[in-house]
């Protein structure tokens, strides 16, 4: 957008401070909008110590002599900015009128004022202007963020005719302040930049089913669950087979005695007898081995008991002696 600005002269002030007023007329040719006028009053007072530089901008719409384009509107707004400045100048206030142009249009303006005093400051200012919502031509305006940069050139002291260079550049197209851009980039960074993929943790290195090893006790390995299989010697197997031949089931006292004599623990002897009984039953079921003598004896005893309990041949009952009844005369 092209803008033409026409400035008038500035009147000087007294010795204690310098001040002036100027009128600005701007022509906006590209948008076809009517011209507007704005008055500017600049006051500079000498001061000492740490002070703050207050800039108040208040605007009031000027009724256009020509009709606006469709979609353009005007709304009043107030901008208040406070920031630290050089202690060589005091408070400055100026007023200007401005228009809101059609939507989706970038507005850039550059206003220069004659130098009025020694101004040494350069800094970034971001401000937010909350405007009233307007419903005109089907458009509504919400919060508008203005982000600009004030630049002041340094100058030496002089008479009241010295001029100050004030430049204000405002851009409305930037949605974020320059101070917030690094924070926004850090928040919106992709997840791939964070924790690296394929990272292994300590809990991933733990084995779920580690192999367990048996501990050697007083008589061989300790009888703990999931222990390594015990390898019996030939002498131990011979003694266990002899005992199993006579007694398939051991009492607690006999089991402790055999474990002590064979240098085994009680649990090993107990498990060996359990496995030996299961092996014997499996072989008998397959018909590889005849029934043991004990079972045969048990079968004979059962048959004898059954024969004894079977009913014998019925014996003829002996005739009972008849008793004659004596009749009494």
Curated annotation (Swiss-Prot):
GO terms for cellular component: nucleus. One of its GO terms (molecular function) is RNA polymerase II cis-regulatory region sequence-specific DNA binding. Gene3D superfamilies: Homeodomain-like (1.10.10.60). Keywords: Developmental protein, DNA-binding, Homeobox, Nucleus, Transcription, Transcription regulation. Residues 283-308 have a biased composition (Basic and acidic residues). Pfam families: Homeodomain (PF00046). Residues 225-284 bind DNA. Residues 208-227, 277-329 are annotated as: Disordered. Its main location: nucleus. It is found in: Nucleus. A motif (Antp-type hexapeptide) lies at residues 200-205. Coiled coil: none annotated. Sequence-specific transcription factor. Part of a developmental regulatory system that provides cells with specific positional identities on the anterior-posterior axis. Belongs to the Antp homeobox family. Labial subfamily. This is Homeobox protein Hox-A1a. It comes from Danio rerio (Zebrafish).
């Amino acid at each position: 957008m092209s803008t033409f600005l026409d400035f008038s002269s500035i009147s000087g002030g007294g010795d204690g401070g310098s001040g002036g007023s100027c009128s600005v007329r701007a022509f906006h040719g590209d948008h076809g909008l009517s011209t507007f006028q704005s008055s500017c009053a600049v006051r500079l007072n000498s001061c000492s110590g740490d002070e703050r530089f207050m800039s108040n901008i208040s605007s009031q719409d000027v009724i256009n002599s020509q009709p606006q384009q469709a979609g353009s509107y005007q709304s009043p707004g107030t901008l208040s900015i406070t920031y630290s400045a050089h202690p060589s100048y005091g408070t400055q206030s100026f007023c200007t009128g401005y228009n809101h142009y059609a939507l989706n249009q970038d507005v850039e303006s550059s206003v220069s004022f004659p130098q009025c005093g020694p101004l040494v400051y350069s800094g970034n200012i971001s401000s937010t202007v909350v405007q009233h919502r307007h419903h005109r031509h089907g458009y509504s305006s919400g919060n508008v963020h203005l982000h600009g940069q004030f630049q002041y050139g340094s100058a030496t002291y002089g008479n009241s005719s010295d001029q100050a260079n004030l430049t204000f550049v405002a851009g409305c197209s930037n949605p974020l302040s320059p101070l917030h851009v690094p924070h926004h980039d850090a928040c919106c960074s992709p997840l791939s930049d964070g924790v690296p993929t394929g990272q292994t943790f300590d809990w991933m290195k733990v084995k779920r089913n580690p192999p367990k090893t048996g501990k050697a006790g007083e008589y061989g390995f300790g009888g703990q669950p999931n222990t390594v299989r015990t390898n019996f010697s030939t002498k131990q197997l011979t003694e266990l087979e002899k005992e199993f031949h006579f007694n398939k089931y051991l009492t607690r006292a006999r089991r402790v005695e055999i474990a002590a004599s064979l240098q085994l623990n009680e649990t090993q002897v107990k498990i060996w007898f359990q496995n030996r009984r299961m092996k014997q039953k499996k072989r008998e079921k397959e018909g590889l081995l005849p029934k043991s003598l004990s079972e045969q004896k048990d079968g004979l005893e059962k048959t004898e008991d059954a024969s004894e309990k079977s009913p014998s041949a019925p014996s003829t009952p002996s005739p009972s002696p008849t008793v004659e009844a004596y009749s009494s005369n």
